[in-house]
């Protein structure tokens, strides 16, 4: 769950010293290259948050690494810990719901809505747009339905 509604993550990204398959943030700049990601929360579903990210730099796994750094790994991202229930209840019903969501979207939930670049020879701007894939839309619908059913009862627990 991302705490702030929007913000900027700045930190050097380089190969993790403990796991060569992962990248990591190095706050002190001792490793890696400078990386900047701006994020904005689009929707909240309890402990799951839909976030939009805009990159100033293009480092390997930048969004995945910066979101993990915030304590919000990408949904179902097994490399960076998003395939585990990190927060919230561990009751069987909730666990089964999450497992069903993992099955509905059997990959990390990262989608490039738009990509753009300047052609190196012509200087022409290129921009490509893409809609959110159906499996990710399905998971969002599931969370919307689940949290709508659970939220009215939240006050009764407190």
Regions found by a protein language model. Name each.
Residues 1-158:
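RNA pseudouridine synthases
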């Amino acid at each position: 769950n991302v705490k702030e509604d929007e913000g900027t993550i700045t930190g050097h990204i380089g190969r993790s010293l403990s796991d060569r398959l992962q990248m990591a943030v190095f706050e002190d700049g001792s490793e890696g290259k400078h990386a900047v990601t701006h994020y904005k929360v689009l929707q909240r579903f309890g402990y799951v948050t839909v976030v939009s990210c805009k990159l100033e730099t293009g480092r390997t796994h930048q969004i995945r690494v910066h979101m993990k750094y915030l304590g919000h790994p990408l949904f179902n991202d097994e490399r960076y810990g998003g395939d585990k229930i990190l927060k919230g209840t561990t009751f069987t019903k909730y666990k089964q719901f999450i497992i069903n969501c993992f099955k509905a979207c059997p990959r990390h939930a990262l989608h490039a809505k738009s990509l753009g670049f300047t052609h190196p020879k012509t200087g022409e701007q290129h921009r490509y747009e893409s809609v959110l894939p159906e499996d990710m839309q399905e998971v969002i619908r599931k969370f919307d339905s689940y949290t709508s059913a659970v939220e009215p009862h939240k006050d009764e627990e407190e």
